[in-house]
Amino acid sequence: MCGIIGKAGIGEVMPELIKGLEMLEYRGYDSAGIAVIHNEKITRCRESGKIINLREKSENNREELTGNVGIGHTRWATHGKPTVENAHPHISNNKKFALVHNGIIENAEEIKKALLTSEEFYSQTDTEVAVKLISKFYKTDVISAVKTACKELTGTFAFGILCSDFPDKIFATAQGSPLVAVKGATGCWITSDLGAINEKSGEFYRIANGEICEISKDSILFYNSEGEEIKKSPERVSLTEETVNKGGYEHFMLKEIFEQPFAIKKTVLSFADKNSIKLENVNIPDEFFKDKLERIIITACGSAYHTGLIGKHVIEKLCKIPVNVEIASEFRYSEPLINENTLTVFISQSGETADTLAALRLCKKYNAKTLSIVNVKSSIIAKESDNVIFTYAGKEIAVATTKAFSAQLVSLYALAIFIAEKRETISNQKKQKLLNELLSLPDKINTTLLKTTDKAKALSKKIYKSTDIFFIGRLYDYGTACEGSLKMKEISYINSQSYASGELKHGTISLIENGTPVIAIGSNTEVFSKTASNIAEVKARGAKVFLVTDESEKDASVFVDDIIYVPSTTPEFQSSLLVIPLQLLSYYTAKRLERDIDKPKNLAKSVTVE
């Protein structure tokens, strides 16, 4: 997740830009930079690595970076390596424009070949294409140049732009990527995250898709996609801790959905490198996994249970060991057939879930090996487990989990690779492929967010008036369908049910009527053709079928009403990408229904009672 900040003010702007970038560090980054207009010329400073490196470099070049107007950026590499050359801001060849960018420009290479053949490029980024395209269209009017350039671009983006011909202004625009403008006591700002600006209160504007914003030290002007000035009413915002923590997003849930690339990156890097999985807090002898392990039982509640449903298939496929997935509130009252050769796994975001804790204590009575996956290191489940895998999702405010779910899921992937290596049930070649895909998941999740947000928003318009919605899938996709269904019901309050696709004909298909929405999850596995058959069955009875699948299934659009594509990865990990548009679909459906998204009725974040 990249971060943008810009300010047109009355004092020296460089220190405030650096401070703002430090406030954006939590989003994840690998390089950072600023640009300031100094004596009607653009001066920039960029560094790879930590922002403290940028701070030191900026201080050493302070005289050249003196100015009242500037922009800054934290970059997480998507196009090009994390080098100084690829860091933002990027500048035009004539040095008139500097630009920072969040998002992905999907047709950057096509634009290079069609419109920028005479331009020289110095980075591997799509962003450099944008700044040079704006410069190409610029005559005397920046708004017109930005408008014309944006019409050529495909993808999602938020831009902060400097032009040396207008040394007291910043220009900004957005398309599918959040950006806000704020008029405060010390000047006017643009930012992707309210927590980055040094103001206690201000007039707050969301930059809508296609709008162009022009800010100076004491004014904010807006133009529509045709370049015509428009009037917008500000929201008066007190930058309280809650408002700041939302980071410019309307709800914590949406913010946490978009934090998933960073949460997954931090979690994955805590146990994986390109050669192996290292679980520091798992102290089970290798010979147990190879010679003694008889079965694995995963126990959890709610969304954590759904990660178990997905993880079961990953572990069984890679480790060749039977896995049962149990609902903690049921399991705790059972008489489990377990012993010292059973590995029991307990999944809980808070580490305090009452039923999961009771299940853990039950298993310890049978001398089973216990391992927990938790997000809170000081939690009781972590303390009472023999072994622990910690997730690094960070604090999750919204009741409906998103980033913690995704962090639990990649932890199960890691556990599967770890056990498979001990049991020698995967080849070195397969292990290497899995590790490479695991390490690439954060970037693929980021791409999924950028590519599917608008599609999920549009699809929500087709389903939000429905009284019933069905989610279907097979194997890995069934667990994903369960999670999509739970998200939909808990925040939209629409009756939503999930089913294994093959079970439809055993009763549920009688509920399908003309226009009933069916969300089908279909990853590229050996059972996709079976899911396609189930889709045909419900289509024949009048259902509106919306398919979520990966890019390898390009022909699938011919037999469904609409489709959302996500990037492809190895089948074992595809759920991590397929779940993203389901989270977004639930969010935008609930938003259309004006639900209390962060605090849905009757639900609590941590269920610490039976």
Predicted regions and their residues:
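Acidic/histidine-rich
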Residues: 153-187, 459, 464-490, 532
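Active-site phosphate/pyrophosphate-binding segments
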Residues: 260-264, 268-297, 387-517, 527, ...
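Glycine-rich phosphate-binding loops that contact phosphosugars or nucleotide phosphates
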Residues: 291-432, 436-440, 474, 521-565, ...
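Generic C-terminus detector
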Residues: 544, 557-559, 569-610
